[in-house]
A protein has these predicted regions:
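A short SAM/SAH-binding and catalytic strip from SAM-dependent methyltransferases
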Residues: 112-127, 131, 147
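A short glycine-rich, Lys/Arg-flanked "PGG" loop and its adjoining helix->strand segment in the class I
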Residues: 127-142
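Conserved catalytic/acceptor-binding region of the Class I
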Residues: 146-212, 220-233
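A short acidic, Gly/Pro-enriched loop at the edge of an enzyme's catalytic core
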Residues: 103-114
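N-terminal, positively charged/glycine-rich alpha-helical extensions of SAM-dependent methyltransferases
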Residues: 2-5, 11-56, 281-284, 288-289, ...
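Conserved SAM-binding loop of SAM-dependent methyltransferases across substrates and taxa
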Residues: 79-90
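Conserved alpha-helix/loop element of class I SAM-dependent methyltransferases that forms part
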Residues: 49-71
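C-terminal lobe and adjacent flexible extensions of AdoMet/dcAdoMet transferase-like proteins
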Residues: 59, 191, 211-298
Length: 298
């Protein structure tokens, strides 16, 4: 069994060429507020059911990879992701805590594996972060991550929009915009990662009311951190109407409501000459026409 070394990100300098250009990306999220709310959730006793599910899935996915990973980084996961027998496979694990900055202080080609859970959905410059991870991976190194996306909290979004339009004559952004599967696949390719794969794990959770759901969201540290969020308190009448609409549209026969969480899984490898590559145009030994003639009716 390998002896593990677990370290926190304390690096003060950034290697040349490792910084993305966050100024070029739109600033959607207040990451300082995110950090404060995650700390508040930690002190209050966090809701970890999604992280627990992702951790289990992460362990299974890593066990399926027949590869030894010595140097590993866990990027911005709000809690402990790698532990137990799976973590014992690694020589060192560097945990990078959630921060206001989106600059990863990781030397080039220093990692065999980069993992992250439930963090990338609140990144302003996700293409830049993926590019930084790609540079930090050794050739044939792996990125494996899970983020919230797709139709997550679509019920809450629709209920708030309907209630605000009815009670206040307008709609304010309540739930962050989430990337979908196709977006993430394209970003992996744009970052220069080979063999990109994405899939989605839909989790439907039932609650007694919309207010119970919102309490769980607070305990995840995942309440509204949009820069353009509403800064004034929501009227009580709007909140009550939102909960009523939620129950009318998204409740089961027993009166409990449904909440959707889409966990998008993404993986990609730093390019290496040993990896399978697509055939170049014109390199096939048999043309389609010849194949059709060969297999067609006699």
């Amino acid at each position: 069994m390998l002896k593990r070394r677990i370290a926190r990100d304390r690096a003060a300098s950034v290697p040349t060429g490792m910084v993305s250009n966050p100024a070029a990306a739109p600033i959607l999220f207040d990451r300082a507020l995110l950090r404060a709310r995650m700390e508040r959730a930690r002190r209050a006793g966090p809701a970890t059911f999604l992280l627990d599910r992702v951790r289990e899935d992460m362990e299974e996915r890593l066990q399926a990879v027949m590869r030894n990973f010595a140097d590993v980084a866990d990027i911005w996961t709000p809690g402990e992701l790698l532990r137990g027998p799976v973590a014992d496979r690694f020589q060192s694990i560097r945990r990078i805590d959630p921060d206001q900055s989106e600059t990863l202080r990781l030397p080039p080609q220093s990692l065999d594996l980069a993992v992250s859970a439930l963090a990338f959905q609140f990144v302003n410059d996700l293409p830049g972060v993926l590019a930084q991870i790609r540079r930090a991976l050794k050739p044939d190194g792996l990125l494996l991550a899970a983020m919230i996306g797709g139709d997550t909290l679509m019920e809450l979004r629709q209920s708030f929009a309907a209630a605000e339009a009815e009670c206040e004559g307008g709609v304010s952004p309540r739930v962050a915009p989430f990337a979908d599967l196709r977006d993430i696949g394209a970003l992996l390719q744009r970052a220069g990662l080979a063999l990109p794969v994405t899939d989605v794990d839909r989790v439907v959770v039932r609650y007694d009311s919309a207010f119970s759901l919102m309490a769980d969201i607070r305990r995840m540290g995942a309440t509204n951190i949009l820069i353009e969020r509403r800064r004034t308190p929501t009227r009580r009448a709007t909140m009550m109407r939102m909960a009523q609409i939620y129950g009318e549209r998204f409740a089961d026969a027993d009166g409990r409501i449904r909440a959707t969480f889409d966990v998008i899984w993404l993986s990609g490898w730093a390019p290496h000459e040993s990896q399978q590559k697509p055939l170049k145009p014109g390199s096939a030994k048999t043309s389609l026409e010849a194949a059709v003639k060969k297999t067609g009716p006699k």
